[in-house]
Amino acid sequence: SYPDGMDVQVYSLNTLKKSYKMTKSLLDREHVTLHIRKNPNIFPALHLIAPRSLFWPNLGLTLDDKLDFILIKKIFEKFKNKKNNFPLKEIIDYLKHNKKLLKINHNVKRK
């Protein structure tokens, strides 16, 4: 759906507390959403699909790797006159017209 890094996950405090009590796994406690997502029968989810103009699930816009930083820096340089206030649609359009930029972080493994 949305590019990786442009999506959100929202949980109630009660859900987080319940998940915490149910698991002893250090990994689940560090990455609190893992336990919740592994148990959809206990924690049902509502998934919102990105509109067609923003749909690009394989695009990585997270900052997990030096290559991610390089790509994000280029995006911010492009939009610097907008004072860091530019919509995702503009980023997507920019990347679609500058496909060479997509090669910067296309091999980064996502979690």
Annotate each predicted stretch with a short phrase:
Residues 1-59, 67, 74, 90-111:
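Conserved core of the sugar-phosphate nucleotidyltransferase
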Residues 4, 62-63, 80-81:
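A short, ordered amphipathic alpha-helix with a cationic face
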Residues 9, 62, 84:
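Residues that recognize and position ribonucleotide moieties
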Residues 26, 80-86:
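Cytochrome P450 catalytic domain signature, combining two hallmark sequence patches
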Residues 72, 77-82:
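A hydrophobic, small-residue-rich beta->alpha segment in the mid-to-C-terminal subdomain
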